[in-house]
Amino acid sequence: MSSVVVVGTQWGDEGKGKITDFLSENAEVIARYQGGDNAGHTIKFDGVTYKLHLIPSGIFYKEKISVIGNGVVVNPKSLVKELAYLKENNVATDNLRISDRAHVILPYHIKLDQLQEDAKGENKIGTTIKGIGPAYMDKAARVGIRIADLLDKEIFAERLQINLEEKNRQFVKMFDSEAIEFDDIFEEYYEYGQQIKQYVTDTSVILNDALDAGKRVLFEGAQGVMLDIDQGTYPFVTSSNPVAGGVTIGSGVGPSKINKVVGVCKAYTSRVGDGPFPTELFDETGETIRRVGKEYGTTTGRPRRVGWFDSVVMRHSKRVSGITNLSLNSIDVLSGLETVKICTAYELDGELIYHYPASLKELSRCKPVYEELPGWSEDITGCKTLADLPANARNYVHRISELVGVRISTFSVGPDRNQTNVLESVWAQI
């Protein structure tokens, strides 16, 4: 029995897709356990770049099973489009499995998402308007429609009718907006359900059977720990649990079956949307990092906010997600900077603190305390080992590992697969 969880340790966009794809080579099952099509991951496979939002990275390996777990909220329309996109590119999808317990995103979720965000005005959260939050709200309120319900025409019609009555009251009376008609949704989305029916099953059985048979299972998180609804910068968070603990809820695999947790981070920090970001850069250095790192959202296309590496954030992520191994990406983006900085602590009202505050008021008063290190000018995109790195780059990597308190198992010096370098095999440690 071998299992590895891949989690983002910052605010998403850390390069999880590439690392998941890299680790997938030695896995037999790859599963997603939370989030929806608000998450975007970019994968290069056989020289082609693919952008996926719902389907796990393992789909490119015909002999491996890819799982969308029960903790994922699925927009059937988006999923059907993504399947068609893969088929157009001659990528087989018959190795996909979708949980019958996963909840469904419907048009009224997306409309409610937009209306609620607009109503917040300056206090908006920066949602991707994909209906993720409202779908999870319905799930918690026990009025959600699951994949199993979508496939049953009678049950789907009954629950859709009940939900539309409630949602339309909100649209008309609270937001002064138009109602959504039953016929605008029912036949179209029932048909989407029929198109994905061949993939639907009890994925908890598949995952547990695989682990019990001694197979290697890789769990792929979306977003990042700092967007976790419990452990992140609430309320500027997603509506699910990207932390490693979310695996047990979102996949139906017990915690005793989790072996390793790989935390993925960039050599700097980025964030899409609103919310606290203590090390954010607003100067030329920030513009350089954004330009060189091509920091634009996979899902939204929005420019990402960028800043220095924050070890306070990383230690928080390590603690709440039980990170055992670190994967450090995008070191090459910092090449050419005369000085690189690492945030080692915050100064709050004249005192040093080393933990990430829950209070947004406290966070707004936190000033990052930096350790400055000399930068490097060399092109490192061809480096294969730590010894190949310039001394200053190597020292930077070592210092990050020291401050976070986790050994680095892989490091990346570019977007391509062959630019990801293994220092210690995670699978070999199990």
From Swiss-Prot:
<keyword id="KW-0460">Magnesium</keyword>
<feature type="binding site">
    <location>
        <begin position="330"/>
        <end position="332"/>
    </location>
    <ligand>
        <name>GTP</name>
    </ligand>
</feature>
<feature type="binding site">
    <location>
        <position position="304"/>
    </location>
    <ligand>
        <name>GTP</name>
    </ligand>
</feature>
<keyword id="KW-0479">Metal-binding</keyword>
<comment type="pathway">
    <text>Purine metabolism; AMP biosynthesis via de novo pathway; AMP from IMP: step 1/2.</text>
</comment>
<feature type="binding site">
    <location>
        <position position="142"/>
    </location>
    <ligand>
        <name>IMP</name>
    </ligand>
</feature>
<feature type="binding site" description="in other chain">
    <location>
        <position position="238"/>
    </location>
    <ligand>
        <name>IMP</name>
    </ligand>
</feature>
<dbReference type="Pfam" id="PF00709">
    <property type="entry name" value="Adenylsucc_synt"/>
</dbReference>
<dbReference type="InterPro" id="IPR001114">
    <property type="entry name" value="Adenylosuccinate_synthetase"/>
</dbReference>
<feature type="binding site" description="in other chain">
    <location>
        <position position="223"/>
    </location>
    <ligand>
        <name>IMP</name>
    </ligand>
</feature>
<feature type="binding site">
    <location>
        <begin position="412"/>
        <end position="414"/>
    </location>
    <ligand>
        <name>GTP</name>
    </ligand>
</feature>
<feature type="binding site">
    <location>
        <begin position="40"/>
        <end position="42"/>
    </location>
    <ligand>
        <name>GTP</name>
    </ligand>
</feature>
<dbReference type="InterPro" id="IPR042111">
    <property type="entry name" value="Adenylosuccinate_synth_dom3"/>
</dbReference>
<dbReference type="GO" id="GO:0046040">
    <property type="term" value="P:IMP metabolic process"/>
</dbReference>
<feature type="binding site">
    <location>
        <position position="13"/>
    </location>
    <ligand>
        <name>Mg(2+)</name>
    </ligand>
</feature>
<feature type="binding site" description="in other chain">
    <location>
        <begin position="38"/>
        <end position="41"/>
    </location>
    <ligand>
        <name>IMP</name>
    </ligand>
</feature>
<feature type="active site" description="Proton acceptor">
    <location>
        <position position="13"/>
    </location>
</feature>
<dbReference type="InterPro" id="IPR042110">
    <property type="entry name" value="Adenylosuccinate_synth_dom2"/>
</dbReference>
<dbReference type="GO" id="GO:0005525">
    <property type="term" value="F:GTP binding"/>
</dbReference>
<keyword id="KW-0547">Nucleotide-binding</keyword>
<keyword id="KW-0436">Ligase</keyword>
<feature type="binding site" description="in other chain">
    <location>
        <begin position="13"/>
        <end position="16"/>
    </location>
    <ligand>
        <name>IMP</name>
    </ligand>
</feature>
<feature type="binding site">
    <location>
        <begin position="12"/>
        <end position="18"/>
    </location>
    <ligand>
        <name>GTP</name>
    </ligand>
</feature>
<feature type="binding site">
    <location>
        <begin position="298"/>
        <end position="304"/>
    </location>
    <ligand>
        <name>substrate</name>
    </ligand>
</feature>
<feature type="binding site">
    <location>
        <position position="40"/>
    </location>
    <ligand>
        <name>Mg(2+)</name>
    </ligand>
</feature>
<dbReference type="GO" id="GO:0005737">
    <property type="term" value="C:cytoplasm"/>
</dbReference>
<comment type="similarity">
    <text>Belongs to the adenylosuccinate synthetase family.</text>
</comment>
<keyword id="KW-0342">GTP-binding</keyword>
<keyword id="KW-0658">Purine biosynthesis</keyword>
<dbReference type="InterPro" id="IPR027417">
    <property type="entry name" value="P-loop_NTPase"/>
</dbReference>
<dbReference type="InterPro" id="IPR033128">
    <property type="entry name" value="Adenylosuccin_syn_Lys_AS"/>
</dbReference>
<feature type="binding site" description="in other chain">
    <location>
        <position position="302"/>
    </location>
    <ligand>
        <name>IMP</name>
    </ligand>
</feature>
<dbReference type="GO" id="GO:0000287">
    <property type="term" value="F:magnesium ion binding"/>
</dbReference>
<comment type="function">
    <text>Plays an important role in the de novo pathway of purine nucleotide biosynthesis. Catalyzes the first committed step in the biosynthesis of AMP from IMP.</text>
</comment>
<dbReference type="GO" id="GO:0044208">
    <property type="term" value="P:'de novo' AMP biosynthetic process"/>
</dbReference>
<comment type="subunit">
    <text>Homodimer.</text>
</comment>
<feature type="active site" description="Proton donor">
    <location>
        <position position="41"/>
    </location>
</feature>
<keyword id="KW-0963">Cytoplasm</keyword>
<dbReference type="InterPro" id="IPR042109">
    <property type="entry name" value="Adenylosuccinate_synth_dom1"/>
</dbReference>
<feature type="binding site" description="in other chain">
    <location>
        <position position="128"/>
    </location>
    <ligand>
        <name>IMP</name>
    </ligand>
</feature>
<dbReference type="InterPro" id="IPR018220">
    <property type="entry name" value="Adenylosuccin_syn_GTP-bd"/>
</dbReference>
<dbReference type="GO" id="GO:0004019">
    <property type="term" value="F:adenylosuccinate synthase activity"/>
</dbReference>
